[in-house]
């Protein structure tokens, strides 16, 4: 069961496997999922919510793969009690999240949202209202040095920030 769109390369791999029958659903509402899981061996899920109520209907289920890094939308305790593994794409988006973090840091330092709004309104004189902070040589503290934090650090060093 593939609940939502995944990258075309991933779908091509699944389609190319002769022993795999792909089941797709148009809706990810609980009733649709409850029916869809009844005869599947595996589930690939992005954001659909798989509660114990839905998963108990999956009598043949052998694995759930989360197409992403978290699994808050899957009742992992229920699956663990049944001996069914849950796979995640650990670290797959760490660089993207790190780049996004860096972008938000720069936007915040430059008060970019307020500046942009003023320009779009034609309020050119407002530029003096917003304080911008120079970040070159700034000291940066990274709270949490997991997959994402480890990617943020070298990006900060590129900007001559002190960690």
Model-found features: residue ranges?
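Rossmann-like dinucleotide/phosphate-binding beta-alpha-beta segment
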Residues: 129-163
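N-terminal glycine-/charge-rich "phosphate-binding" loop or analogous flexible N-terminal tail
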Residues: 1-40, 160
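Rossmann-fold NAD(P)-dependent oxidoreductase module
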Residues: 13, 100, 104, 151, ...
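Phosphate/diphosphate ligand-binding glycine-rich loop within oxidoreductases
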Residues: 41-120
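Generic structural signal for small/hydrophobic residues in well-ordered secondary structure
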Residues: 14, 43, 64, 79, ...
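A short, aliphatic-rich alpha-helical micro-motif
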Residues: 36-37, 55-58, 135
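Structural motif corresponding to alpha-helix initiation and N-cap regions
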Residues: 8, 27-34, 48-52, 73, ...
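Short gly/ser/thr-rich secondary-structure transition/capping motifs
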Residues: 22-28, 45-46, 119-128
């Amino acid at each position: 069961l593939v609940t939502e769109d995944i990258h075309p390369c991933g779908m091509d791999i699944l389609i190319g496997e002769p022993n795999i029958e792909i089941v797709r659903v148009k809706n990810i509402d609980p009733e649709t999922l409850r029916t869809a899981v009844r005869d599947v061996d595996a589930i690939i899920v992005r954001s659909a919510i798989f509660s114990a109520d839905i998963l108990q209907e999956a009598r043949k289920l052998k694995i759930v793969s989360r197409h992403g890094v978290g699994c808050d939308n899957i009742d992992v305790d229920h699956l663990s009690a049944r001996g069914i593994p849950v796979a995640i794409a650990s670290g797959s988006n760490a660089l993207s999240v790190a780049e996004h973090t860096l972008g938000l840091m720069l936007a915040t330092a430059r008060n970019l949202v307020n500046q942009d709004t003023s320009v779009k309104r034609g309020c050119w004189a407002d530029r003096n209202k917003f304080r911008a902070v120079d970040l070159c040589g700034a000291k940066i503290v990274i709270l949490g040095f997991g997959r994402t934090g480890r990617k943020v650090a070298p990006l900060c060093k590129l900007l001559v920030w002190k960690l």
